[in-house]
């Protein structure tokens, strides 16, 4: 499926399904992903394409969990697709040429890569299915009429058309369920369980186990077919995963992808070093996310932070513009119980190391939310990590109260419910919205402490 400089691994890991090796074409932007990709791609493409799609699905899931309206959700999907997974219509072929097929190829491969990653548990499969179905619905609704019809024709659904005679027999009932003029409307019928949302809304007439679906409601039926197809494919993929575990190059990547939605770090630009001084840090704390605020408070209280806390907080301060010289001043003043000699011996080197001035000279970046969530577990005296994950409910409610979110408020309950469901980035996003009412609802969820800080400063 992908290439390396050493060997091919296509044959060994081709079991997305039993499809034969054949050239795949993409006549439209819509895809039921029935045929797996079989040509080689590089490991870099494998990872990059998967991460781009992961970000798209992550924003879709976030928007749905935050109860965005239909219009808000569509706006979020369009924005993130244009940035991460754009696909042009056939009308652009004369302009884009081969790049149009490359866009569709990336979409095809990235779906199957994530299908592998998210087939590993029932919970992951459900999340993947929900997000992919929402993405497909958006694309289907917004596709051009001619391309949409060409796609439907290619699927051979074998829908049973309703004759004019049958339509006349049930005309009044069809009219009542459609709630529109059906004089020029055509209908087809399918088993009622194929369109549960239409049945629930009473948008179709049901007779002898068949739902009479107006052509204008075909979206629901097509999406239902997509979901059913993908659900079966995920179950099939799950059964073949043990064979995939034999490849020690694929496994680490897939494990990483399945841990959660990856933060789109490239969208976050850190301020120039020197933007703030050591003496100004306290005045910026009100703009910190809870993770950084907690570390700052522990540092003030204990005059010290353990290793992982220093690393997490130090890199955050670096991200927001604290230079290495100012960082040395900040930490020296904070560690009031430490002698000058001990500070120089035990802490100075590590601070300079994070700025790329010692050791391997690597210039480290601050941790994103996923890295914080999957970092080292807390030990005695530790303060690093994500408070939404590590705090007890009582401690979380107290922390929210200190930020102006009343314990008995609907907002507090929303945050607590998100935490209980382990949607920590949703909880953080909701806290931002509640503490920045002038900003309103965020289009994208919080996925990086620096993102929170920058949005707060701009508000």
UniProtKB/Swiss-Prot annotation:
State if Iron is listed as a keyword.
yes
Q: Which UniProt keywords apply?
A: 4Fe-4S, Chromosome, DNA replication, DNA-binding, Iron, Iron-sulfur, Metal-binding, Nucleus, Primosome
Q: Which GO terms describe its biological process?
A: DNA replication initiation; DNA replication, synthesis of primer
Which residues are [4Fe-4S] cluster-binding? Answer: 291, 369, 386, 428
**UniProt-listed CDD domains:** PriL_PriS_Eukaryotic
The principal location of this protein is nucleus
Q: Name one GO cellular component term.
A: alpha DNA polymerase:primase complex
Where along the sequence do coiled-coil regions lie?
A: none
Query: Cofactor binding mode, per the note?
Result: Binds 1 [4Fe-4S] cluster.
Listed cofactors: [4Fe-4S] cluster
> Under the GO molecular function aspect, what terms does this record hold?
4 iron, 4 sulfur cluster binding; DNA binding; metal ion binding
Q: Enumerate the subcellular locations listed in this protein's record, separating them with semicolons.
A: Nucleus; Chromosome
By sequence similarity, the record places it as follows: Belongs to the eukaryotic-type primase large subunit family.
How the protein assembles, per its UniProt entry? Heterodimer of a catalytic subunit spp1/pri1 and a regulatory subunit spp2/pri2, also known as the DNA primase complex. Component of the alpha DNA polymerase complex (also known as the alpha DNA polymerase-primase complex) consisting of four subunits: the catalytic subunit pol1, the accessory subunit spb70/pol12, and the primase complex subunits spp1/pri1 and spp2/pri2 respectively.
Protein purpose: Regulatory subunit of the DNA primase complex and component of the DNA polymerase alpha complex (also known as the alpha DNA polymerase-primase complex - primosome/replisome) which play an essential role in the initiation of DNA synthesis. During the S phase of the cell cycle, the DNA polymerase alpha complex (composed of a catalytic subunit pol1, an accessory subunit spb70/pol12 and two primase subunits, the catalytic subunit spp1/pri1 and the regulatory subunit spp2/pri2) is recruited to DNA at the replicative forks.
What is the recorded name of this protein? DNA primase large subunit
Name the source organism. Answer: Schizosaccharomyces pombe (strain 972 / ATCC 24843)
Which gene holds the coding sequence for this protein?
Answer: spp2
């Amino acid at each position: 499926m992908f290439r390396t400089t050493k060997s091919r691994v296509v044959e060994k890991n081709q079991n997305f399904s039993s499809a034969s090796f054949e050239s795949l074409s993409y006549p439209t932007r819509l895809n039921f992903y029935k045929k797996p990709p079989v040509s080689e791609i590089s490991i870099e493409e494998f990872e990059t394409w998967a991460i781009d799609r992961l970000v798209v699905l992550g924003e879709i899931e976030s928007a749905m969990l935050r109860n965005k309206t239909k219009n808000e959700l569509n706006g979020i999907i369009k924005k993130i697709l244009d940035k991460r997974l754009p696909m042009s219509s056939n009308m652009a072929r004369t302009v884009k040429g081969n790049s149009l097929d490359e866009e569709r190829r990336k979409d095809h491969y990235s779906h199957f890569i994530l299908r592998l990653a998210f087939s590993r548990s029932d919970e992951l499969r459900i999340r993947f299915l929900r997000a992919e179905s929402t993405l497909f619905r958006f694309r289907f609704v917004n596709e051009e009429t001619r391309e949409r019809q060409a796609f439907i024709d290619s699927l051979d659904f074998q829908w049973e058309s309703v004759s004019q005679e049958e339509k006349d027999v049930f005309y009044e009932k069809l009219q009542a369920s459609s709630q529109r003029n059906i004089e020029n409307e055509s209908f087809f019928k399918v088993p009622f369980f194929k369109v549960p949302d239409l049945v629930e809304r009473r948008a179709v007439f049901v007779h002898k186990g068949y739902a009479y679906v107006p052509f204008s409601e075909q979206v629901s039926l097509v999406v239902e077919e997509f979901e059913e197809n993908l659900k079966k494919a995920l179950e099939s993929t799950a059964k073949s995963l043990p064979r995939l575990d034999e490849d020690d190059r694929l496994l680490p990547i897939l494990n990483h992808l399945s841990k959660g939605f990856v933060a789109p770090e490239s969208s976050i630009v850190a301020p120039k070093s020197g933007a703030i001084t050591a003496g100004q840090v306290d005045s910026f704390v009100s703009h910190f996310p809870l993770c950084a605020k907690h570390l700052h408070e522990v540092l003030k209280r204990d005059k010290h932070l353990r290793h992982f806390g220093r690393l997490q907080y130090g890199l955050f301060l670096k991200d927001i513009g604290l230079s290495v010289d100012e960082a040395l001043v900040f930490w020296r003043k904070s560690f009031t119980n430490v002698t000058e000699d001990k500070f120089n011996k035990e802490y100075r080197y590590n601070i300079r190391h994070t700025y790329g001035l010692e050791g391997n000279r690597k210039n480290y970046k601050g941790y994103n939310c996923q890295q914080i969530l999957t970092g080292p577990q807390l030990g005695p005296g530790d303060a690093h990590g994500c408070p939404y994950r590590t705090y007890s409910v009582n401690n979380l409610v107290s922390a929210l109260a200190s930020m102006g979110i009343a314990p008995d408020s609907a907002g507090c309950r929303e945050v607590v419910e998100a935490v209980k469901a382990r949607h920590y980035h949703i909880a953080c996003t909701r806290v931002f919205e509640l503490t920045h009412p002038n900003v309103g609802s965020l289009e994208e969820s919080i996925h990086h402490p620096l993102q929170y800080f920058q949005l707060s400063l701009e508000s």
